[in-house]
């Protein structure tokens, strides 16, 4: 059976009260509609068609290469939205799944089971349903004595006995493709909203003698539709729990899973420990045997094995195996920390390479620089890389020593085995085995104390 997917993503989402198109709001680092499309892609459909309207260009950018797109110029209901895909799908044989783009929690396993059930039962249409703890506001699934689906009753239209039903319509459907397009031609808009409803297709098919069924999924939470910021937060909470539990099953320790915020595309190796209050975003990859402590934030970075990140921020950078950073340090984009290097307290690195086993202890800024291996950088060292117009680069060779409080004014080259005395301002190259001292000579003035204004103060004698 050929599979096709239609994603409805044309609604504006006014209840979000946002300039951002609703389906582009993120849940754990991915737009809601991208979660839906990624789950659909996992069942290997022959074609995915996303119906776009408001913010079409932005949606197409997010889903580039993952879907075809059709514009719904005027939003006239779910049935009308599906009709827009006629040119892409109407001539094809197979089954078509229809899902909305604001339901980010559906899994590929649920979609796969829906397709399989639809095919096994020989249905013309299959509704994805769930048992709701509180079904208020949902369309109820009304079945006959044999369990066949008779109709979907909306909250406002239901009789008291019908509203007691807890099996609800999730808004996801699977149709025989040819039956779908034949029935859509019969859907009208004679209702209070003047819209074309996709649910009318079920009644049309049933009256035509076609089989209409329902597949009840076990996890009601998957069906959560996001229409406002409250639902967005709830979807994020559920997705975050799902992500963190997946990592824990793979051998990652979470000290407090409820406060560890891990994006959907993050990878973490086994025996790594994640403390509470940690944020890891985008496509970050973390190796095995690492420790990420509270207050750390890692964005789109590569972290090797055996790395310790202590309450620090890492952005678009690489830390190789057995390195450590922090507390309270910051790797800015395009930084490379090589194997065994140490970055201590309050160290900021920007677009720089720190060589193997090099130590940058504390209170230091390293920007636009390449440091070799086995270097010791003292406290308070500054790489002065900006003249107000352009950035300049400095290179420091292997096994050099940079004394505390020194400033290296770029561009300069410090050779291997060079020694820079503490509190020096270095503006020229330093050669191999040379020691550079660049500071004012100390002068001690004898008996100068008695010339001070405070010299007569008894407390100062």
From Swiss-Prot:
Binding site for acetyl-CoA: 422, 439
Known cofactor(s): Mg(2+)
A Pfam family of this chain: NTP_transf_3
Subcellular localization, as worded in the UniProt entry: Cytoplasm
Enzyme's top EC category: transferase
Biological process according to GO: cell morphogenesis; cell wall organization; lipid A biosynthetic process; peptidoglycan biosynthetic process; regulation of cell shape; UDP-N-acetylglucosamine biosynthetic process
Free-text comment on the cofactor: Binds 1 Mg(2+) ion per subunit.
Protein EC: 2.7.7.23, 2.3.1.157
The organism's place on the tree of life at top rank: Bacteria
Catalytic activity: alpha-D-glucosamine 1-phosphate + acetyl-CoA = N-acetyl-alpha-D-glucosamine 1-phosphate + CoA + H(+); N-acetyl-alpha-D-glucosamine 1-phosphate + UTP + H(+) = UDP-N-acetyl-alpha-D-glucosamine + diphosphate
SUPFAM superfamilies for this protein: Nucleotide-diphospho-sugar transferases (SSF53448), Trimeric LpxA-like enzymes (SSF51161)
GO annotation, cellular component aspect: cytoplasm; membrane
Positions of the UniProt region annotated as N-acetyltransferase: 251-461
Residues the record lists as binding Mg(2+): 102, 227
Keywords: Acyltransferase, Cell shape, Cell wall biogenesis/degradation, Cytoplasm, Magnesium, Metal-binding, Multifunctional enzyme, Nucleotidyltransferase, Peptidoglycan synthesis, Repeat, Transferase
Location of region: Linker: 230-250
Protein residues bound to UDP-N-acetyl-alpha-D-glucosamine: 8-11, 22, 72, 77-78, 139, 154, 169, 227, 332, 350, 365, 376
Entry's transmembrane regions: none
Region of interest: Pyrophosphorylase: 1-229
Function comment: Catalyzes the last two sequential reactions in the de novo biosynthetic pathway for UDP-N-acetylglucosamine (UDP-GlcNAc). The C-terminal domain catalyzes the transfer of acetyl group from acetyl coenzyme A to glucosamine-1-phosphate (GlcN-1-P) to produce N-acetylglucosamine-1-phosphate (GlcNAc-1-P), which is converted into UDP-GlcNAc by the transfer of uridine 5-monophosphate (from uridine 5-triphosphate), a reaction catalyzed by the N-terminal domain.
Protein name: Bifunctional protein GlmU
Protein's gene: glmU
């Amino acid at each position: 059976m050929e599979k096709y997917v239609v994603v409805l993503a044309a609604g504006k989402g006014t209840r979000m009260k946002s300039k951002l198109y609703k389906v582009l709001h993120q849940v754990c680092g991915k737009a809601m509609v991208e979660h839906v499309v990624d789950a659909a892609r996992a069942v290997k459909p022959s074609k995915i068609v996303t119906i776009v309207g408001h913010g079409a260009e932005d949606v197409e950018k997010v889903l580039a290469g993952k879907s075809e797109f059709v514009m719904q110029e005027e939003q006239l209901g779910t049935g009308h939205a599906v009709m827009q895909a006629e040119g892409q799908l109407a001539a094809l044989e197979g089954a078509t799944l229809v899902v909305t783009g604001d339901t980010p929690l559906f899994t590929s396993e649920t979609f796969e089971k829906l397709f399989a059930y639809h095919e096994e039962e020989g249905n013309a249409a299959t509704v994805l349903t769930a048992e709701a703890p509180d079904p208020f506001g949902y369309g109820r699934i009304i079945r006959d004595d044999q369990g066949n689906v008779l109709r979907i009753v909306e909250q406002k239209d239901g009789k008291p006995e019908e509203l007691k039903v807890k099996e609800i319509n999730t808004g996801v459907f699977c149709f025989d493709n040819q039956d779908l397009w034949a029935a859509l031609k019969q859907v009208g808009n004679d209702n209070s909203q003047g819209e074309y409803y996709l649910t009318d297709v079920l009644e049309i098919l049933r009256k035509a003698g076609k089989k209409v069924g329902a597949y009840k999924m076990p996890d009601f939470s998957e069906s959560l539709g996001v229409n406002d910021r409250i639902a967005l937060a709830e979807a994020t909470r559920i997705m975050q729990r799902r992500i963190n539990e997946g990592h824990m099953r793979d051998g990652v320790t979470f000290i407090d899973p409820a406060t560890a915020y891990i994006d959907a595309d993050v990878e973490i190796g086994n025996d790594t420990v994640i403390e509470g209050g940690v944020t890891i975003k985008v496509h970050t990859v973390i190796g095995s045997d690492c420790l990420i402590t509270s207050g750390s934030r890692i964005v789109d970075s590569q972290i090797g094995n055996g790395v310790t990140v202590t309450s620090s921020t890492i952005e678009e950078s690489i830390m190789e195996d057995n390195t450590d950073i922090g507390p309270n340090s910051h790797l800015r984009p395009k930084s490379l920390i090589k194997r065994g290097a140490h970055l201590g307290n309050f160290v900021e690195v920007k677009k720089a390479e720190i060589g193997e086993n090099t130590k940058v202890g504390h209170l230091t800024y390293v920007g636009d620089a390449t440091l070799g291996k086995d270097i010791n950088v003292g406290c308070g060292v500054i790489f002065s890389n900006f003249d107000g117009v352009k950035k300049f680069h400095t290179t420091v060779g292997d096994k050099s020593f940079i004394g505390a409080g020194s400033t290296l004014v770029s561009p300069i080259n410090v050779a291997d085995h060079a020694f820079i005395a503490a509190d020096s301002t270095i503006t020229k190259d330093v050669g191999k085995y040379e020691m550079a001292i660049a500071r004012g000579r100390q002068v001690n003035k004898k008996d100068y104390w008695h010339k001070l204004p405070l010299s007569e103060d008894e407390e100062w004698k």
